[in-house]
């Protein structure tokens, strides 16, 4: 058996050459052994056998640890393991010459884990002498008496490892434990406090006194780890006595133990205490003095980090004292004295040290100070803040005490440190993108928060110092300085925008901060050195600043605005040699113009267009195997067309001939594409790009011409748009149609054509109708895909919305409604055929488990079904546009009546799967309800429909609705195949819509209380409900509620009726 286990371990570990199958079998066999309690003795023997190599011993230890932890061992087996562990420890301690390295560290750690597992299950009842036995076994009992050299270094090594493991097991707060385990851990700690903690502390302290730190640093480090981990739950007075504290602090002197000692001290001072006791402890330790003595002599970054963390921890604990004193209610003389003493320690001892660490060349050291600075500034806000928005938490809670010179000096010093650390490091170059990004996220962003807090505490200090910082650097030739200037200008502007200065709203624009910001923006724009800097960080951040904070640009006229645009149109910006800068500037150019909408005469526009013209040619470069363009800049080019469109639309001369300068090259390229003998992918894609550019330009011209809040107002557009512009865009529409007709089989061209037409609508208004007629016909002749048809239906809905009051539009849709509905059905049929072709839908789709209550559902949602629902949703949205735009009379015209039966069947028939698609069902039922409302009687009764009066009544339509709607209303909730559960939210929504539908049908059938005169009531009571064996008393109850209830009440009644029947 032993030999077999050794072989299995060797195979599983890959120590011998074996195939994967053998390894798999070995691992499976090994797992079986771990769960077999009969294997414990075997693994214990392997654990203690001197013939076992380190790997075998480690595996054996691991298995036994898991078996103890899993609780599968009997009491006798635990006793057996304990005895074996004791003998194993004895053998390790009795190594000749006491060689600590004779056993690898990972084996020592695993032995310590095994002993800890035994402690956890035996200490409370069976092994209460655990620690006395351990000191005897490990030959360290002499340390209980006094410091001496007559103890085993190997023994103290094991002892410390076991102590650390025990703390991790019973006191580590990193992991969430069950209530039962937490209670047991608490009981173990209580028992240790009573029986053994004093013993542990004595051994730790006497060990520190006995060893030479520079010779046994590993032992000292483990002792520090023990003290630091146990201090949170043992009596602090066992450790915090002058002799012991001095002993521990002394280990800061040695490079090998500096970090562990600092970590230990951090844990000690973080111990929860009363404020007066904590202040006494910190005064006793005087750690800041000690740390300050090392500050200039430490070269190791890790040590500097830990010392900074220690100094910050001292400051944080003093800040907690301040917070606790502030919370004293009512304040006492003692709390005020305590507050003053703690605050003085912070100002005189902690802050000078913290500010030095903040200025450290390594950011990882700087970061250690952030927690303290953040907490201390929070206390200062409560004491001194005079800024912040009126009514904000800061403004309300501040005591608004006068800022004394010591705190003022701190704020000024902190700002100066922030300014220095915010600068990009000298070692960073343009290529150090990742390093600079990390710096901005981890350091600069935190320092900005500190700046903002200072602004709230004392706006004048912030304003004075940030102004001096900007003024001192703004003329620098170093790109890092200018980048910082721009960053600080952004911060200053944000502080004004967020009103950190606490100014009344009506005074912000003329306030001192705003005036200073205006002045600096002017200085920046006038600084020619900036525009000669070859740095993408300066270039991009400059334009970001200008665009985001343009309100601080105090232009005196067109000349200043043109000067700014010339900066954009320079090698510093839009013609930059770096693509990253170039493309970003194109976007910012468009954003600035869309935001500011400047007005220039045509002469100026000619100059601007002439400068940008070289960037406008649209080229298609190489395509990958998927037909996708590689390294495309086209999407960024669209921003150029957008920006130019806004400028042209807003020109002060109302002269739009300049559009030819942009459109003519595009038309020429389109003509070349159309004339091309082969429809190569590059040619088609170039046509697509050109159409999108034209559409983008058109929309931007309209945006520049019409005020932002009137963009969708057709009357305003008609008033402002000149006939010359309309003619140009009619020409564009014709060009689009020609392009579409040549490339109609390409989806990208169809999409681009629809995109462009959508953007021509606001400008051309009803003049677009004849062009739209041709476009729609071209679309209907094309082989459309599902998503295309959905988008096309949305486009038609937009047309109806824009022109529903135009006679020409009414006639257009009157003629095209039949072909459109026919096209929808063709696509629906194609999708259905695809669905039927899915031989195994479980593999092609998604299973939705909708089990709830008594109607467990297992619906298969295939890709084809999903496509069908998306198309139906677009179709219903198209029909809904007839309702919302008051043109339902279209469905009752001579042409409309031909397609009306098909449309009504589409809104009256549903499959069980469709019932589960809430968004589609809700839209579809809403369409049906409105159809019944507006022409359920056979006559169009919509008072807002301007064509209703000219449409004759359609006889028999009311009877059709009655015979179709009433079965629908009752079959959906009651037929088993629909698996309708009204208790589900989605079904409840559908039930509410069905109640609305039934009530509307009753009203459109004449209303009233007489069954004989209302065909809906007559069909309900005499035909349908008796046919489905509805109880007579419930029939009359339903009719009574239908007659007397308002919509809300009937909805509630109907939902309850379904609930009662399906319970």
From Swiss-Prot:
The main place the protein resides is nucleus
Q: Which GO terms describe its molecular function?
A: small GTPase binding; tRNA binding
Q: Which cell locations does it reside in?
A: Nucleus; Cytoplasm
GO terms in the biological process aspect are: tRNA processing; tRNA re-export from nucleus
| Cross-referenced Pfam families | Exportin-T (PF19282), Xpo1 (PF08389)
Q: Which InterPro entries match?
A: ARM-like, ARM-type_fold, Exportin-1/Importin-b-like, Exportin-T_C, XPOT
Q: Which UniProt keywords apply?
A: Cytoplasm, Nucleus, RNA-binding, Transport, tRNA processing, tRNA-binding
Write out the transmembrane intervals.
none
GO CC terms? cytoplasm; nuclear matrix; nuclear pore
User: PANTHER family, alphabetically?
Assistant: EXPORTIN-T (PTHR15952:SF11), EXPORTIN-T/LOS1 (PTHR15952)
Functional summary from the UniProt entry? tRNA nucleus export receptor which facilitates tRNA translocation across the nuclear pore complex. Involved in pre-tRNA splicing, probably by affecting the interaction of pre-tRNA with splicing endonuclease.
Q: Which family does it belong to?
A: Belongs to the exportin family.
Full protein name: Exportin-T
């Amino acid at each position: 058996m032993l030999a077999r286990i050794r072989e299995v371990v060797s195979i599983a570990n890959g120590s011998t050459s074996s195939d994967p199958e053998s390894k798999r079998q070995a691992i499976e066999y090994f797992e079986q052994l771990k769960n077999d309690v009969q294997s414990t003795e075997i693994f214990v023997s392997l654990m203690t056998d001197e013939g076992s190599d380190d790997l075998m011993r480690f595996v054996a230890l691991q298995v036994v640890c898991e078996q103890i932890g899993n609780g599968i061992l009997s009491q006798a087996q635990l006793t057996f393991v304990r005895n074996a562990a004791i003998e194993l420890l004895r053998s390790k301690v009795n190594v000749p010459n006491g060689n600590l390295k004779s056993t690898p560290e990972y084996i020592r750690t695993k032995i310590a884990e095994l002993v800890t597992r035994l402690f956890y299950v035996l200490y409370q009842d069976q092994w209460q002498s655990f620690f006395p036995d351990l000191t005897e076994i490990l030959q360290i009992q002499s340390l209980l008496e006094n410091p001496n050299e007559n103890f085993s270094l190997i023994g103290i090594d094991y002892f410390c490892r076991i102590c650390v493991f025990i703390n991790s097991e019973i006191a580590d707060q990193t992991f969430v434990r069950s209530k039962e385990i937490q209670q047991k851990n608490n009981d173990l700690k209580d028992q240790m406090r009573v029986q053994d903690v004093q013993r542990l502390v004595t051994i730790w302290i006497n060990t520190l006194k006995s060893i030479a730190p520079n010779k046994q640093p590993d032992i000292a480090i483990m002792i520090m780890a023990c003290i630091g981990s146990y201090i949170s739950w043992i009596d602090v007075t066992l450790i915090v006595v002058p002799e012991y504290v001095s002993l521990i602090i002394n280990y800061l002197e040695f490079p090998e133990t500096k970090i562990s000692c600092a970590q230990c001290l951090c844990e000690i001072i973080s111990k929860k205490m009363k404020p007066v006791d904590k202040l006494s402890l910190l005064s006793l330790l005087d750690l800041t003095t000690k740390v300050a003595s090392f500050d200039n002599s430490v070269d190791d970054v890790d040590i500097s980090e830990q010392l900074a963390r220690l100094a910050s921890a001292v400051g944080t604990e003093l800040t907690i004292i301040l917070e606790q004193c502030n919370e004293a209610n009512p304040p006492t003389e003692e709390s005020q004295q305590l507050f003053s003493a703690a605050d003085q320690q912070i100002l005189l001892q902690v802050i000078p040290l913290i500010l030095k660490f903040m200025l450290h060349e390594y950011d990882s050291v700087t970061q250690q100070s952030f927690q303290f600075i953040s907490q201390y500034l929070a206390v200062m806000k409560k004491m001194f803040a005079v800024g912040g928005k009126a009514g904000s938490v800061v403004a309300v809670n501040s005591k608004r005490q006068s800022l004394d010179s010591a705190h003022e000096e701190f704020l000024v010093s902190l700002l100066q440190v922030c300014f220095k650390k915010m600068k990009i490091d000298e070692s960073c170059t343009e290529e150090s993108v990742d390093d600079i990004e990390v710096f901005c996220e981890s350091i600069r962003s935190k320092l900005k928060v500190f700046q903002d807090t200072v602004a709230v505490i004392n706006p004048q200090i912030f304003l004075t110092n940030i102004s001096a910082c900007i003024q001192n650097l703004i003329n620098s030739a170093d790109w890092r300085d200018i980048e910082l200037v721009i960053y600080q200008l952004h911060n200053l502007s944000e502080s004004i925008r967020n009103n950190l200065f606490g100014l009344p709203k009506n005074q912000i624009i003329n306030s001192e901060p705003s005036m200073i910001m205006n002045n600096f923006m002017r200085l920046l724009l006038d600084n020619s050195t900036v525009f000669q800097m070859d740095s993408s960080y300066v270039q991009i951040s400059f334009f970001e600043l200008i665009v985001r904070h343009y309100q601080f640009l105090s232009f005196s006229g067109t000349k200043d605005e043109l000067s700014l645009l010339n900066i954009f149109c320079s090698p510093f910006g839009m013609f930059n040699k770096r693509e990253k800068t170039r493309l970003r500037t194109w976007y910012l150019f468009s954003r600035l113009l869309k935001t500011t909408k400047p007005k220039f005469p045509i002469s100026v526009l000619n100059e601007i267009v002439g400068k940008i013209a070289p960037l406008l040619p649209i080229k298609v470069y190489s395509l990958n195997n998927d037909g996708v363009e590689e390294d495309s800049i086209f999407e960024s080019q669209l921003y150029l067309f957008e920006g130019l469109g806004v400028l042209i639309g807003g020109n002060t001369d109302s002269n739009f001939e300049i559009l030819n300068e942009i459109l003519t090259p595009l038309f020429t390229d389109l003509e070349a594409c159309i004339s091309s003998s082969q429809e190569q992918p590059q040619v088609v894609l170039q046509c697509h790009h050109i159409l999108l550019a034209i559409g983008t330009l058109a929309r931007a011209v309209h945006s520049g011409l019409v005020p932002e809040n009137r963009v969708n107002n057709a009357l305003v557009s008609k008033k402002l748009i000149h006939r010359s512009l309309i003619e140009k865009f009619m020409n564009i529409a014709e060009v689009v149609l020609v392009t579409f007709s040549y490339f109609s089989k390409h989806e990208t061209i169809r999409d681009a054509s629809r995109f462009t037409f959508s953007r021509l609508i606001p400008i051309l208004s009803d003049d677009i109708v004849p062009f739209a007629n041709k476009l729609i016909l071209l679309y209907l002749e094309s082989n459309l895909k599902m998503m295309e048809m959905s988008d096309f239906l949305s486009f038609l809905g937009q047309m109806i919305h824009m022109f529903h009051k135009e006679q020409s539009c009414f006639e257009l849709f009157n003629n095209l409604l039949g072909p459109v509905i026919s096209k929808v059905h063709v696509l629906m049929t194609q999708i259905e055929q695809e669905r039927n072709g899915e031989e195994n839908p479980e593999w092609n789709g998604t299973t939705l488990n909708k089990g709830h209550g008594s109607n467990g559902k297992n619906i298969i949602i295939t890709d084809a079904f999903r496509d069908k629902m998306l198309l139906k949703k677009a179709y219903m949205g198209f029909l809904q546009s007839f309702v919302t735009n008051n043109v339902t009379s279209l469905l009752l015209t001579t042409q409309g009546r031909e397609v009306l039966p098909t449309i009504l069947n589409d809104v009256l028939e549903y499959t069980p799967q469709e019932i589960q698609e809430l968004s589609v069902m809700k839209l579809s039922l809403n369409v049906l309800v409105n159809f019944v409302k507006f022409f359920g009687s056979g006559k169009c009764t919509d008072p807002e429909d301007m064509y209703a009066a000219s449409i004759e009544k359609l006889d028999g339509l009311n009877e059709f609705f009655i015979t179709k709607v009433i079965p629908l209303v009752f079959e959906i909730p009651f037929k088993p195949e629909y698996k309708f559960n009204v208790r589900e939210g989605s079904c409840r929504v559908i039930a509410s819509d069905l109640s609305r539908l039934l009530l509307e049908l009753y009203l459109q059938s004449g209303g009233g209380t007489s069954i004989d005169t209302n065909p809906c009531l007559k069909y309900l009571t005499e035909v349908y409900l008796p046919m489905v064996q509805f109880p007579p008393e419930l029939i009359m109850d339903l009719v009574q509620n239908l007659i007397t209830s308002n919509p809300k009440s009937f909805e509630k009644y109907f939902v309850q009726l379904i609930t009662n029947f399906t319970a």
